[in-house]
């Protein structure tokens, strides 16, 4: 249904083969002209492509961050500084630069979205277990003015 709607809207849609089953979605590329054409996240083999001019980069980054979503984004460019700009300024959980957009390695690469796409790292990565911790700071002045150092160092008998 989603793919058919985009065809009706006049977007270029490319599929590996026609979809003949309601239970299967063929890998699909949908070329859209602006980010606001996306109204919800799509899960499945659907890739949205946006072509943009250099003069539109800051607007596109702003649109990405204001969309509310941020699971995965792919950037394909020969301009290293542009890839760096997108990766630094876009609030996205997983950013793939000049490569395929699959293959987060559970256990070593954090994987999770931002905003409406999730709440950060869900699997893998060195900080994964940190989400299960409840930090507490206790600060005690053990040498308060007038304190007796000998009394402060008495050990309890076992």
Where in this protein do the model-derived segments appear?
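Conserved C-terminal structural/oligomerization subdomain of aldehyde/semialdehyde dehydrogenase
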Residues: 3, 8, 19-158
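Diglycine-centered glycine-rich loop/turn motifs
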Residues: 13-17
């Amino acid at each position: 249904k989603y793919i058919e709607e985009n065809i009706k809207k006049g977007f270029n849609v490319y599929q590996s083969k026609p979809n003949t089953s309601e239970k299967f979605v063929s890998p699909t590329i949908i070329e859209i002209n602006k980010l606001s054409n996306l109204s919800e996240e799509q899960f499945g083999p659907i890739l949205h492509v946006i072509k943009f001019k250099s003069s539109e980069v800051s607007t596109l980054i702003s649109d990405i961050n204001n969309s509310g979503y941020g699971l995965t984004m792919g950037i394909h460019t020969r301009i290293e500084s542009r890839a760096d700009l997108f990766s630094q300024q876009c609030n996205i959980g997983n950013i793939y630069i000049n490569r395929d957009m699959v293959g987060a390695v559970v256990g070593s690469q954090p994987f999770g979205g931002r905003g409406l796409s999730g709440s950060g790292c869900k699997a893998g990565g060195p900080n994964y277990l940190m989400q299960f911790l409840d930090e507490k700071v206790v600060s005690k002045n053990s040498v308060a003015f007038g304190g007796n150092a000998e009394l402060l160092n008495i050990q309890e008998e076992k």
